[in-house]
């Protein structure tokens, strides 16, 4: 009976030591979230490059992008 109690106590101590070691590990640091301005600039830079290049406006994709930009500008009131 005493032997069982000692084994259970040693197991509990070992389990607590393992939990303490796991809890002591630092959490991985998350990358800081980009600011809304930086995110908007990253999204707008390919569009600005396409609008600056007249040959790019001749592509079929440019028509969709241009119509999206015009619709967005109208929606925001920047006609």
UniProtKB/Swiss-Prot annotation:
Please report the residue spans annotated as repeat (AXPX): 24-27, 30-33, 44-47, 52-55, 58-61
Q: What protein is this chain from?
A: Eumenine mastoparan-OD
Q: What family name appears in the similarity comment?
A: Belongs to the MCD family. Mastoparan subfamily.
Quote the tissue specificity entry: Expressed by the venom gland.
Q: Specify the domain of life of the species encoding this protein.
A: Eukaryota
Those residues forming the propeptide, per the database entry, are 25-62
Transmembrane spans: none
* UniProt entry tagged with the keyword Acetylation: no
For this chain's UniProt record, which GO biological process terms are given?
defense response to fungus; defense response to Gram-negative bacterium; defense response to Gram-positive bacterium; hemolysis in another organism; innate immune response
- Name the UniProt key words of this record, in alphabetical order: Amidation, Antibiotic, Antimicrobial, Cytolysis, Fungicide, Immunity, Innate immunity, Membrane, Repeat, Secreted, Signal, Target cell membrane, Target membrane, Toxin
**For the modification Leucine amide, which residues carry it?**
76
MF term (GO), any: toxin activity
Keyword Transcription on this protein? no
Subcellular location per UniProt equals: Secreted; Target cell membrane
Q: What does this protein do?
A: Antimicrobial peptide with strong activity against the fungi C.albicans (MIC=6 uM) and B.cinerea (MIC=10 uM), and weaker activity against the Gram-negative bacterium E.coli (MIC=97 uM) and Gram-positive bacterium S.aureus (MIC=97 uM). Shows cytolytic activity against insect cell lines. Has potent hemolytic activity against ovine erythrocytes (80% at 50 uM), but has no hemolytic activity against human erythrocytes. In vivo, peptide injection in the vicinity of the head and thorax of lepidopteran larvae induces feeding disorder that lasts one or two days before recovering.
Q: One GO CC annotation, please?
A: membrane
Q: Which residues form the signal peptide?
A: 1-24
């Amino acid at each position: 009976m005493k032997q069982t109690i000692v084994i259970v106590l040693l197991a509990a101590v070992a389990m607590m030591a393992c939990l303490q070691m796991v809890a002591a590990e630092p959490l991985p640091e998350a990358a800081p979230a980009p600011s809304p301005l930086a995110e908007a600039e990253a999204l707008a830079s390919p569009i600005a490059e396409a609008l600056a290049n007249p040959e790019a406006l001749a592509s079929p994709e440019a028509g969709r992008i241009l119509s999206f930009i015009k619709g967005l500008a109208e929606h925001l009131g920047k006609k």
